[in-house]
C-alpha cells in the first residue's frame, strides 16, 4: 500500500494508458516517492530497472542510477578465512528469469536453495524483455493452426546464429520450449498470444494477451512462485568470489551484502545466472572494440560479474567476443523499442522516408542495414491500429518518444523526411500487403498496413543488446574448465553462457533460453548437491 491507495487502485481510476498499470507487479513494494516529489526526496527508480536516459515526465530526478562495482579485497580475504555464515545445497546467483527458474527447479528437487541478487529487486535483464517466448508444439500454436516442428525451430535458430551455435544446446532449447511454456502457465503466466519475430519461419513467439511485455510478467510470476515455495531470496547481495575445495569442487562463495558486509556462504553446488556484460564499458572495449561507443539497452547490473568470477577459477569461455546489436533502440536513449512493434506491422524507413530492409530479418542484418543508412539511424512508422493493439507502444508515447500526425505528409514534415517519398513508401507497402507479397524486400508477414490516422513514428538506432558468448556449458548446464572438463558443482544458464545462440540471437529465444536452461541448471545442481550429502 501507498499513501493514496495501491497501484492497482491508481491504475483502475484511469481509462487511458497509465504508468501505474505497467508496474503493478514490480513497483508494489516502493511508494510513490520513488518517482514523484512528495513527502520525501524522490529517486528515479525507473532507471535502476530500465536504464534509459530520457527525462521522465513524471519525475524531477533524471539522473541514472549507478551500480557500485568496487570490491574491498581485504574484506573478501577476511571473509574467506572466517566460518560460513550459513550452509546451503544450491546457491543461485542472479534473480532474473534464468536464476528464478533455476532456484525454483532446485527447490522442487528437494534442495536447500538461496538466491542472491545484487540489485535492490529481482528481475535483472529479464525485466526488459518485451517481445516474447519462442516455443514449438504448444496448444496456442495448434489453436491457430500453425504448423511448426522442432526441426524448423532448430533450423531457424541455427540459421539466425549463422551456424555458430552448439547444435546440441539448440536441440535442447527447441525440445524443451513447449514444456517451459506449460511450466510457466502452471504458475499462472499468460502466454496465450502467438506472433512472429524476426528470423522465424512461422508464428512461435508466445506472449501475454494484449501486447504486455513478456519479461516483467514472467518475472512477477516466477518471483511469486519462488516466495510460495520457500526459496531463500535476498536482494542487495552480490557474489564476488567463488570458492573451491582442494579437489577443485565448488565449496561456496563470498558475498557482499549492501547492509551486511562481506561474508561466506558454503554451498555444494552453484548456479551462475548473472546475465552478460552489455553494461560493462571496459569489457565491451576489450572484447568488441567496434561497439565501445555504442549505447546499451541492458539493465545497469549487466556488468559481467559471473564471467569474471568464472574466469578467475579457470572456466572456459566460448564466443565471448560476439555481441549482438539490437536494431531498434530509441535514438539518444537506452529504451529498447521491442521487436514486437515491427512484428505486428511497423515499417522501417531511413531519414529520407525510404524502406531499406525486410523489417523481420535477423537483428544483426537489420542493425547492419541501419548502420549503412544516412546518419546511421532510422524511423519506425505505423498507424493508429497498431498503436491501439500494443500497450507497450502507448508506453513509448507516454515517455514522449513518438511523433504523431493526422497525415503522412505532416508526419514527414515533423520527422524532417520528404513527404512524397514517405507517402509512396506507405502506399507501396499497403499494396504489397493486400497482394500478400512484399516485392521490395520479401517481408514474410504483414499483419497491419499504414492506413488509419493518426500516424506515428519513433526514431531508432542500433544499440548493444545481448552478449552472445560466455561460459562454456555442457547439455546438462555444467560449466567447463579450459580443458573442456565439467567443473564439479558449477552450473550456468542464460546470457552468462555461450553456445546457444551462436553469432546472432533470434528475438524470443532469450526468454526460452532462461526458462529451459534455467530449469535444467537448477535440476542438475540439486541432483549434484543432494548426491554429495
Enumerate the language-model features and the residues they cover.
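Beta1/beta-strand and adjacent pyrophosphate-binding region of the FAD-binding site
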Residues: 82-98, 114
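A glycine-rich dinucleotide-binding beta-alpha-beta segment and adjacent secondary-structure elements
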Residues: 241, 421-504
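An anion/pyrophosphate-binding glycine-rich loop and adjacent beta-alpha core
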Residues: 307-309, 315-421
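Helical element adjacent to the flavin cofactor pocket in flavoenzyme catalytic cores
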Residues: 210-268, 307-313
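Internal hydrophobic alpha-helix adjacent to the cofactor/substrate pocket in enzyme cavities
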Residues: 309-316, 423, 514-533
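Glycine-rich loop(s) and the adjacent beta-strand/alpha-helix scaffold that form part
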Residues: 258-261, 265-330, 517-520
Amino acid at each position: 500500500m501507498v499513501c493514496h491507495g495501491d497501484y492497482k487502485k491508481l491504475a483502475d481510476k484511469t481509462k487511458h494508458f497509465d504508468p501505474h498499470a505497467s508496474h503493478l507487479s514490480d513497483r508494489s513494494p516502493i511508494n510513490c516517492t520513488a518517482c514523484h516529489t512528495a513527502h520525501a526526496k524522490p529517486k528515479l527508480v525507473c532507471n535502476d530497472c530500465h536504464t534509459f536516459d530520457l527525462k521522465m515526465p513524471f519525475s524531477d530526478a533524471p539522473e541514472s542510477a549507478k551500480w557500485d562495482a568496487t570490491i574491498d579485497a581485504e574484506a573478501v580475504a577476511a571473509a574467506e578465512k572466517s566460518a560460513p555464515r550459513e550452509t546451503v545445497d544450491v546457491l543461485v546467483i542472479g534473480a532474473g528469469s534464468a536464476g528464478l527458474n533455476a532456484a525454483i527447479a532446485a527447490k522442487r528437487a528437494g534442495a536447500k536453495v538461496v538466491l542472491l541478487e545484487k540489485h535492490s529487486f529481482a528481475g535483472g535483464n529479464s525485466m526488459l524483455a518485451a517481445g516474447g517466448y519462442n516455443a514449438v508444439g504448444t496448444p496456442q500454436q495448434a489453436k491457430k493452426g500453425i504448423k511448426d516442428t522442432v526441426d524448423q525451430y532448430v533450423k531457424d535458430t541455427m540459421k539466425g546464429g549463422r551456424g555458430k551455435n552448439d547444435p546440441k544446446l539448440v536441440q535442447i532449447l527447441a525440445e524443451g520450449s513447449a514444456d517451459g511454456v506449460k511450466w510457466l502457465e502452471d504458475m499462472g503466466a499468460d502466454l496465450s498470444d502467438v506472433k512472429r519475430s524476426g528470423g522465424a519461419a512461422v508464428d512461435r513467439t508466445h506472449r501475454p494477451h494484449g501486447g504486455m511485455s513478456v519479461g516483467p510478467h514472467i518475472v512477477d510470476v516466477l518471483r511469486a512462485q519462488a516466495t510460495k515455495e520457500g526459496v531463500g531470496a535476498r536482494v542487495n547481495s552480490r557474489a564476488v568470489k567463488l570458492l573451491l575445495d582442494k579437489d577443485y569442487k565448488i565449496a561456496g562463495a563470498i558475498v557482499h551484502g549492501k547492509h551486511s558486509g562481506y561474508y561466506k556462504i558454503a554451498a555444494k553446488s552453484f548456479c551462475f545466472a548473472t546475465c552478460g556484460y552489455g553494461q560493462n564499458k571496459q569489457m565491451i572495449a576489450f572484447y568488441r572494440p567496434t561497439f565501445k561507443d555504442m549505447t546499451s539497452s541492458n539493465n545497469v547490473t549487466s556488468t559481467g560479474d559471473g564471467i569474471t568470477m568464472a574466469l578467475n577459477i579457470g572456466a572456459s569461455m566460448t564466443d565471448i567476443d560476439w555481441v549482438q546489436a539490437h536494431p531498434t533502440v530509441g535514438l539518444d536513449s537506452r529504451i529498447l523499442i521491442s521487436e514486437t512493434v515491427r512484428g505486428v506491422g511497423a515499417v522501417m524507413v531511413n531519414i529520407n522516408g525510404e524502406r531499406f530492409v525486410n523489417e523481420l530479418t535477423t537483428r544483426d542484418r537489420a542493425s547492419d542495414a541501419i548502420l549503412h543508412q544516412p546518419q546511421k539511424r532510422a524511423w519506425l512508422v505505423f498507424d493508429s491500429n497498431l498503436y491501439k493493439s500494443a500497450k507497450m507502444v502507448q508506453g513509448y508515447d507516454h515517455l514522449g518518444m513518438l511523433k504523431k500526425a493526422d497525415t503522412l505528409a505532416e508526419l514527414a514534415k515533423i520527422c524532417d523526411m520528404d513527404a512524397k517519398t514517405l507517402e509512396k513508401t506507405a502506399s507501396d507497402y499497403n499494396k504489397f500487403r493486400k497482394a500478400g507479397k512484399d516485392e521490395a524486400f520479401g517481408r514474410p508477414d504483414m499483419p497491419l498496413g499504414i492506413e488509419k490516422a493518426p500516424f506515428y513514428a519513433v526514431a531508432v538506432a542500433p544499440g548493444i543488446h545481448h552478449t552472445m558468448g560466455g561460459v562454456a556449458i555442457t547439455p546438462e548446464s555444467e560449466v567447463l574448465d579450459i580443458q573442456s572438463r565439467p567443473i564439479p558443482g558449477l552450473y550456468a544458464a542464460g546470457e552468462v553462457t555461450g553456445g546457444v545462440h551462436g553469432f546472432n540471437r533470434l528475438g524470443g529465444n532469450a526468454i526460452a533460453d532462461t526458462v529451459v536452461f534455467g530449469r535444467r541448471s537448477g535440476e542438475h545442481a540439486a541432483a549434484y548437491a543432494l548426491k554429495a550429502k
